[in-house]
């Protein structure tokens, strides 16, 4: 066997062709990502039992890796746990962890495409939430369907005092209930459109089982269009640009199938937050659909302009009058974040200086540019990301720098939080209703940071967040229906409770435990911990999108990473200077030589030193040039 030093901390490791001889039994104290892992990235398990040695074992019993687990006290769950790090196992296959004196884990895969099915299942979940139509799908041999629902959406009584109807069909049911809320659509659509813009080449070829699968629009965007079609109906019929806050029954309905809910549904009066979120969503839709359906794009941007103009002339934060309704309020404390996001998306789509100035003036009012913890009630991050990654000219360099600094500081903080948590939870010890959604939403911060300043720590922390919701948690359970180890069976979801089928509808992330890590209960009545929601699912979709049709960085050139450690920093500049001055004769690898050629002229010389130094002080925004 081969013996060596594992880089994360002088631990002896062995690679051996020996076979497991002991009969290990499954033990739920060995907690890991039951979906699996990507080659050349972090792979960790948490063992809630006293142990030392662990083995990574192939399905046929061959031991491919022997390691020593390291102990730590988890301040969150208040238990001593042992971390098994097997990141150096990269051969594709199916494995399990065997821990002497404890037992074995669930089987898991190591593969480049390990998240493809999970991504498609989360997208299937969105399709199955469609309102105003019938839906039908077979998953794991079980058929899920319902008939056309809510085809009378919606009445205008609370808008104009008349019991008349304006079409507001389509869109997704929001959560465990069947209502439709513009403000929660904001973070949902924004997250999914950003997934498209950040990972377009990876998502464009993905085939989904949806009715529109044979048209000329990518399937991922087809699903989003179904929601935008509804969003467009939410403008007031008077042409003012005001946007209704939601379409809803007066009270929450019972646990019945959607086609059996016949209570009248109404447009609920406008709010400034809903109007601003409408602007942002339709502005994004305009630029994203333009290559595929220019007429639709034009419809979207024209609607966005009308509502933006209204907001400009009506600067006050206006809350929706929801006095006739007991359904979800989605009432934001402030609309400053919504208006900032609207300005960013209008500028990115149209390029007019008016929108740029609006965004920059608003962004200057935010003392913290990037928040680690964000959801429907704080969408400022979405606008900051769009502005920061925009290739349009005219940005304020000082503001760009301020947002970058905040982004990288926040991303670094998330990495530290994950590394110091016994289960790699990126949100640390913070818990509230729907916190699982935030855990996977934080991958957005990490991925944008990785675009601005490539760092494998950011990518691995994003994978930690995914691992947490698929089994590396206190329960050793997946938090996503239909996926992974022992997933939720009783979500707070009216379809799952009313259809007479034992298995819940698939592809939904449940909210997770609160007020603490041990407070999740898998029962239908626990809306506090076991509800589903489009904003949480969209966050999961973003998290998984980054690793669909993924190319391992092992094979990619990371310009500026002269020492080939997966990061670009001052250490690389020092090595590059020494190499150019011939103080060292070689770079660590052939990949490092490619990484060092930051101007791509086929040579490594003083020009590369100059460019890399300017990049590190952020005079240059991107490598290579």
Swiss-Prot record:
<dbReference type="GO" id="GO:0030245">
    <property type="term" value="P:cellulose catabolic process"/>
</dbReference>
<comment type="similarity">
    <text>Belongs to the glycosyl hydrolase 9 (cellulase E) family.</text>
</comment>
<dbReference type="InterPro" id="IPR018221">
    <property type="entry name" value="Glyco_hydro_9_His_AS"/>
</dbReference>
<keyword id="KW-0732">Signal</keyword>
<feature type="active site">
    <location>
        <position position="522"/>
    </location>
</feature>
<feature type="domain" description="Dockerin">
    <location>
        <begin position="555"/>
        <end position="625"/>
    </location>
</feature>
<keyword id="KW-0136">Cellulose degradation</keyword>
<dbReference type="InterPro" id="IPR033126">
    <property type="entry name" value="Glyco_hydro_9_Asp/Glu_AS"/>
</dbReference>
<feature type="active site">
    <location>
        <position position="492"/>
    </location>
</feature>
<dbReference type="Pfam" id="PF00404">
    <property type="entry name" value="Dockerin_1"/>
</dbReference>
<dbReference type="InterPro" id="IPR004197">
    <property type="entry name" value="Cellulase_Ig-like"/>
</dbReference>
<protein>
    <recommendedName>
        <fullName>Endoglucanase D</fullName>
        <ecNumber>3.2.1.4</ecNumber>
    </recommendedName>
</protein>
<keyword id="KW-0119">Carbohydrate metabolism</keyword>
<keyword id="KW-0106">Calcium</keyword>
<dbReference type="GO" id="GO:0008810">
    <property type="term" value="F:cellulase activity"/>
</dbReference>
<dbReference type="InterPro" id="IPR008928">
    <property type="entry name" value="6-hairpin_glycosidase_sf"/>
</dbReference>
<dbReference type="InterPro" id="IPR018247">
    <property type="entry name" value="EF_Hand_1_Ca_BS"/>
</dbReference>
<dbReference type="InterPro" id="IPR001701">
    <property type="entry name" value="Glyco_hydro_9"/>
</dbReference>
<dbReference type="InterPro" id="IPR012341">
    <property type="entry name" value="6hp_glycosidase-like_sf"/>
</dbReference>
<dbReference type="InterPro" id="IPR014756">
    <property type="entry name" value="Ig_E-set"/>
</dbReference>
<feature type="signal peptide">
    <location>
        <begin position="1"/>
        <end position="17"/>
    </location>
</feature>
<dbReference type="InterPro" id="IPR036439">
    <property type="entry name" value="Dockerin_dom_sf"/>
</dbReference>
<dbReference type="InterPro" id="IPR013783">
    <property type="entry name" value="Ig-like_fold"/>
</dbReference>
<dbReference type="Pfam" id="PF02927">
    <property type="entry name" value="CelD_N"/>
</dbReference>
<keyword id="KW-0378">Hydrolase</keyword>
<dbReference type="InterPro" id="IPR002105">
    <property type="entry name" value="Dockerin_1_rpt"/>
</dbReference>
<feature type="active site" description="Nucleophile">
    <location>
        <position position="177"/>
    </location>
</feature>
<keyword id="KW-0624">Polysaccharide degradation</keyword>
<comment type="function">
    <text>This enzyme catalyzes the endohydrolysis of 1,4-beta-glucosidic linkages in cellulose, lichenin and cereal beta-D-glucans.</text>
</comment>
<keyword id="KW-0326">Glycosidase</keyword>
<feature type="active site" description="Proton donor">
    <location>
        <position position="531"/>
    </location>
</feature>
<dbReference type="InterPro" id="IPR016134">
    <property type="entry name" value="Dockerin_dom"/>
</dbReference>
<dbReference type="Pfam" id="PF00759">
    <property type="entry name" value="Glyco_hydro_9"/>
</dbReference>
């Amino acid at each position: 066997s081969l013996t060596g030093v594992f880089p994360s901390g002088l631990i002896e490791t062995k690679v051996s062709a020996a076979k497991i001889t002991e009969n290990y039994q499954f033990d739920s104290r060995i907690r890991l990502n039951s979906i699996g892992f990507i080659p050349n990235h972090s792979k960790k398990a948490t063992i809630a039992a006293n142990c030392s040695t662990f083995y990574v074992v192939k399905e046929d019993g061959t031991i491919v890796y022997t390691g020593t687990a390291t102990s730590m006290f988890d301040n969150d769950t208040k238990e001593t746990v042992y971390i098994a790090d097997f990141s150096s196992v990269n051969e594709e296959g199916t494995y399990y962890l065997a821990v002497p004196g404890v037992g074995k884990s669930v089987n898991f895969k190591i593969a480049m495409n390990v998240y493809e099915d999970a991504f498609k299942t989360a997208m299937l979940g969105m399709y199955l939430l469609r309102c105003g139509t019938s839906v039908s799908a077979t998953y794991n041999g079980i058929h899920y369907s319902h008939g056309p629902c809510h085809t009378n959406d919606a009445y205008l009584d609370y808008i104009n005092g008349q019991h008349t109807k304006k079409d507001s069909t389509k869109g997704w049911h929001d959560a465990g209930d069947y209502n439709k809320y513009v403000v929660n659509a904001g973070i949902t659509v924004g997250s999914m459109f950003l997934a498209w813009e950040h990972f377009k080449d990876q998502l464009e070829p993905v085939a989904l089982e949806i009715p529109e699968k044979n048209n000329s629009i990518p399937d991922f965007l087809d699903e989003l269009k179904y929601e935008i079609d509804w969003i467009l109906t939410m403008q007031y019929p008077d042409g003012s640009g005001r946007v209704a806050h939601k379409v809803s029954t007066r009270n929450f309905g019972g646990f019945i199938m959607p086609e059996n809910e016949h209570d009248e549904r109404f447009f609920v009066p406008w709010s400034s937050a809903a109007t601003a979120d409408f602007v942002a969503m339709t502005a994004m839709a305009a630029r994203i659909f333009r290559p595929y359906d220019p007429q639709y794009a034009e419809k979207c941007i024209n609607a966005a302009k009308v509502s933006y103009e209204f907001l400009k002339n009506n600067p006050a934060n206006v809350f929706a009058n929801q006095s006739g309704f007991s359904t979800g309020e989605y009432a934001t404390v402030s609309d400053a974040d919504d208006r900032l996001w609207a300005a960013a998306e209008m500028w990115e789509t149209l390029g007019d200086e008016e929108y740029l100035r609006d965004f920059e003036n608003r962004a200057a009012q935010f003392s913290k540019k990037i928040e680690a913890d964000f959801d429907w009630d704080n969408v400022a991050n979405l606008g900051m990301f769009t502005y920061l990654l925009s290739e349009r000219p005219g940005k304020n360099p000082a503001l760009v720098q301020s947002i970058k600094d905040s982004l990288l500081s926040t991303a670094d903080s998330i990495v530290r939080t994950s590394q110091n948590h016994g289960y790699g939870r990126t949100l640390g010890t913070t818990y509230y209703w729907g916190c699982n959604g935030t855990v996977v939403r934080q991958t957005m911060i990490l991925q944008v940071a990785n675009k601005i300043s490539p760092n494998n720590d950011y990518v691995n922390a994003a994978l930690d967040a995914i691992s947490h919701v698929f089994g590396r948690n206190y329960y050793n359970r997946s938090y996503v229906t239909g996926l992974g180890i022992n997933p939720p069976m009783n979500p707070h979801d009216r379809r799952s409770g009313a259809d007479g089928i034992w298995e819940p509808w698939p592809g939904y992330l449940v909210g997770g435990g609160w007020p603490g890590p041990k407070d999740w209960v898998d029962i239908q009545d626990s809306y506090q911990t076991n509800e589903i929601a489009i904003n949480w699912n969209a966050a999961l979709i973003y998290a998984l999108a980054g690793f669909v049709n993924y190319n391992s960085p092992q094979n990619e050139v990371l310009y500026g990473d002269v020492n080939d450690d997966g990061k670009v920093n001052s250490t690389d500049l020092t090595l590059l200077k020494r190499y150019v001055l011939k103080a060292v004769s070689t770079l660590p690898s052939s990949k490092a030589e490619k990484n060092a050629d930051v101007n791509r002229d086929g040579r490594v010389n003083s020009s590369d030193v100059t460019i890399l130094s300017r990049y590190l002080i952020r005079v240059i925004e991107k490598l290579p040039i």
